[in-house]
Amino acid sequence: MRAQDGRYSILELSDQGRRAGVIDVHRSLGVLADDPEGFVAAIADPAHRILTLTVSEVGYCRSARTGTLDVERDDVRSDIADPTHPRSTIGLIARGLAVRAASGAPITVLSCDNLQSNGRATRAVLTEFLHASAASGDVLNFVDNHVTFPNSMVDRIVPGTTAQTVADVAGLMHVDDRCPVPAEDFTMWVLEDHFAAGRPAWDRAGAIMSDEVEAYELVKLRLLNGSHSLIAYLGLLDGHPTIADAWAQGFVRDAVRTCIANEYLPSITLPRGFDVDVYVDSLSHRWANSALGHRTS
C-alpha cells in the first residue's frame, strides 16, 4: 500500500457482474511490529479522535475459556510487568491512552471485529489490563470518563484476495493493484452512536446508528451464520462444492427456510423497525451469489 500511496481497490462480486472502485482514505501507513512507538504516538495525538480496530479475535488478548484478559499469554505477562514497552495489542492501546491522558483529549475506541458486544468486551479487557499493570488513578479516570467504546457489527462477505482478483481489477480499471480486496455487493454496518469526540457522517453512506447493536448481532448470528452453516453441511453431504451450488437445491432452501421460521426467529427479538422479510430475501440473494465461490468445505 505504501507503493500505491495508501490506495487500494474494492472488487464487488455479484452474479450481475464485477465492478471495481478505488479507496483513497489513508494518509499514512505503518507496520506495527516495525514501529510500535509510532502507534502509541498516534493514539496519544489529540488530533486523532477515533481509533478503529480490525485485529481479529486473538488481538483482544482474551481467554477463550473465561472471556477475560488472558494473563497466561507471554506478551500480556510481559506488558503487565513493563507497560511502557508493550508488545500486545491491548498493551499498546493502553500505553497510547496512558500518554493521551495527560492532554485529557477524549477519544473513541471502535472495534470492528466479529466479536459479540465488541465495544463492551474491548473496554472490559483494556480496563483489566490497566488495573493489572498498576495504571495511575489519573489514567483510569481518563479512560472511564473520556474514552468511549461503542458496540458495532459489520456484515459483509469478503473472500481472500487471489491472482484472479488482481487480474479482474486490472481488466476493469487498467491498473496494477497489488492489494485489491474482493467483496460481495451487500454491506451492513451497525454502530452505537456513542462517540467521545464526534464522528464522520457514516450514516449518510448507509451505516445504521442504533442502540440495538446486540439485537442486530443475533440476527446475523442466527439467520445468516446459522443458516450458512446448515447450507454448507447439507450441500457438502449432497456433493455440492459451493454455497451457491448448495442453495440451488430445493431441499436445502426448504430446510433453511423452515429453520429460520421455526427455530431461529422465535429465539431472537428483532431490532425496532427491522423488516425481516426483506432481510431474509437479501440472504437468499447472497447465498445464490456464485461469483463469490464460497466453499461448503
Predicted regions and their residues:
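Substrate/ligand-engaging "lid" and interaction regions
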Residues: 1-297
